[in-house]
Amino acid sequence: MKIERVIVQNFRSHKNSEIEFKPGINLIIGQNGAGKSSLLDAILVGLYWSKRMRLRGLKKDEFTRTGTRGAIIEITFEEDGTKYKVLRDFARNVSYLKRLDGREWRHVTETSMESVSSFIDRIIPYNVFLNAIYVRQGQIDAILESDETRDKIVKEILNLDKLEKAYDNLGKIRKYIKYSIEEKEKFIMKTENIEDLIRTQEKSFTEVLNEIRNISSNLPRLRRELEGIKEEVKTLEATFNSITELKLRLGELNGKKGRLEERIRQLESGIEEKRKKSKELEEVVKELPELEKKETEYRRLIEFKDEYLVKKNELEKRLGILSNRLQEVKRKIKDAESKVARIRWIEERLKEIQEKIMKLEPRVREFEDAMRLKAQMESLKSKLGGLEPEKINEKLLYLENRKKELEEEIDKITRKIGELNQRSKDRRLAIIELKKARGKCPVCGRELTEEHKADLLRKYSLELSSIEKEIQEAKALERQLRAEFRKVENELSRLSSLKTIADQIIEIRERLSKINLEDLKRDKEEYELLKSESNKLKGEVESLKKEVNELNDYKNESTKLEIEIDKAKKELSEIEDRLLRLGFKTIDELSGRIRELEKFHNKYIEAKNAEKELRDILESLKDEREELDKAFEELAKIETDIEKVTSQLNELQRKFDQKKYEEKREKMMKLSMEIKGLETKLEELERRRDEIKSTIEKLKEERKERESAKMELEKLNIAIKRIEELRGKIKEYKALIKEEALNKIGEIASEIFSEFTDGKYSGIAIRAEDNKVKLFVIYDGVERPLTFLSGGERIALGLAFRLAMSMYLIGKVDLLILDEPTPFLDEERRRKLIEIMERHLRKISQVIIVSHDEELKDAADHVIRIRLEGGASKVEVVS
């Protein structure tokens, strides 16, 4: 992979930055907090942003520039002769990856964050990029943390974790095959007596078939005998059923005869009663003609009274409503005529207010802008945690100086610990040699007496205790210094991120200092009062105009109301005239006459009811007489039928033999039960036959499976042996690859580290063990542990090892990114790093280095400077 161009917008301090990278060594220089490392983080996010990165604690809110919707990152790079362009737009949550095809860019993935990351991960895995290509700030000495950490990093770079996974998967397969072998062996043992079971079932099958044949031969004879008896019983049952039906028929006829005789008696009695009642009703009906005259007058007066009362009430109520509305309309006409002058005054006042509002509007907008700036400044201040913006630069300078002091102190104490460890080791060796010595002192060469030996041992032991005490004190001081160093670094990181915010606050404060907020506030308040008065007056004038516009409507309504009132009065007069024409002066006189006619009305009602009842009785008499005639005819017919049925019944009873009928029925039942029992037994035998047959087939199938299991067992035993061999080869191959890679990395790292230390150390030694990679330095031809190194030498070793891993990957990966590789290197080692860059890093197609160290420019092909201006990072190409 070679990175050609990076465009970053709204990413931390980068508002809108574009950088082109060239083949060779690209150096990005600038002061702390300028945005150098942020640019490298933007490359990492642009290439690999996914759920995996979010899970590792990197959040959009942390890298999105304050006051923007989201960062935008575009990276153009080349891989294996093909150009790609990746875009991450966090404001719209959009991402794409395109490939240059001729002169046209074409999509190669779906437009989603995860799809783009997956494709790039196939080109260069994320772990390889993070652990070998991109060496992040503060991680140079991470390789020296522990043997386990080194082992993990080496495995990821060499893809040994995949071989380990294959090794583990083969172990799982081996376990499964062993389980299968056990299951096959259990099955073979379980089916050991399969042949005996088959013979037993075949014998049972033959016995069942014989029973089926015996029953099948007897059933036809018994069924024929049953059919003959059934025919005889059927004939006797037909006669028996006929006798039963005739008895039922005779009972029905006698019952019907009794009911008819009872009905005839009821009809004769009812006819006599209705004849008497009809004579009584005829006497009442004779008075009906005279009563009808009185009823006609009664109805006419009642109808008029109801109409009179309803209409008079409606007219009086309507007159009241119309009169009230007329008074209200006349009042509104008077009010509307008085409001025209008020409208003219309001319109003049509104013109004056509008002129003042137009003059104040620019001042109001200026006030609102100032208040927004003030709110933004307060929001930014809250992020500073109480710090004054002007104090941040002073504190940053102090912390950078303190960081350098701590680096020097840590380097000094680390050297001291190394020297003390060596002195301690020397004293321990001297004590061991002294204990072994006989005759001659190994220290001074004099004769060694027991007393002299004891004195020397006491002396060396006291010196050793003193050295150990000094080591513990030095280590305690080192821990204290490193703890303070981490605090200083954390505070530097925090203040660097706050510097942009502080610059924005200062800029806003300068803009606000040029504005008179009190004057603007007074103008704003006057503006609001005028707007409020204007709205009230506009509402009032609209209401007044509406009322004035309705004046003609009110006048027309007044005229119509007067006409309606006259019409209602006329209708009221007409209904009073109708009362007089009927002969009554008042409604009370009319009510008195109606009360006189009510007794005739009641008699009329009684006579009309009697007339209706008489008609009903006469009609009923006619129907009952007809029904009586029909009943006599039906009774004669039923008596004839009774005689006929009685004759037929006597004839059948004479021919029917009840005893013979019962004997035949009993024999038929016994035969049916015998046949049913045989059929049931036959069904059971056939079911058993099928079960035995199925069992035999299953047993034979198990016999086949048993033979197959024996063959599979042989294959599984061969397979498990091959898996064991393959696991052994994978283990050997993994160890071989790891050893070869570590040897090569060791050679490269030895050369670089030796150059760093001017030959003080002739190289390094690497030994691989299970899940560990142990690292030693070679001093005076002897392997020494890493505790032998001073602080600066440890950093040099870490850098040498990280560079060696990247050099090893040349041919597989042609890109290296270093973020601040020199923070703990002294001047001499920084100079050596330049020589190493010239000699070794030029073997890599493209190297990107971020540093605040100006000395590195001498070794770079392309130099880019980043500085902070007005809270935003600015990019400048130096060479």
From Swiss-Prot:
One of its GO terms (biological process) is double-strand break repair. Zn(2+) binds at C441, C444. Keywords: ATP-binding, Coiled coil, DNA damage, DNA repair, Hydrolase, Metal-binding, Nucleotide-binding, Zinc. Its cofactor is Zn(2+). The keyword Cell membrane does not apply. ATP binds at residues 12, 32-38, 137, 788-793. The two conserved Cys that bind zinc constitute the zinc-hook, which separates the large intramolecular coiled coil regions. The 2 Cys residues coordinate one molecule of zinc with the help of the 2 Cys residues of the zinc-hook of another Rad50 molecule, thereby forming a V-shaped homodimer. Belongs to the SMC family. RAD50 subfamily. Homodimer. Forms a heterotetramer composed of two Mre11 subunits and two Rad50 subunits. This is DNA double-strand break repair Rad50 ATPase. It comes from Pyrococcus horikoshii (strain ATCC 700860 / DSM 12428 / JCM 9974 / NBRC 100139 / OT-3). The gene is rad50.
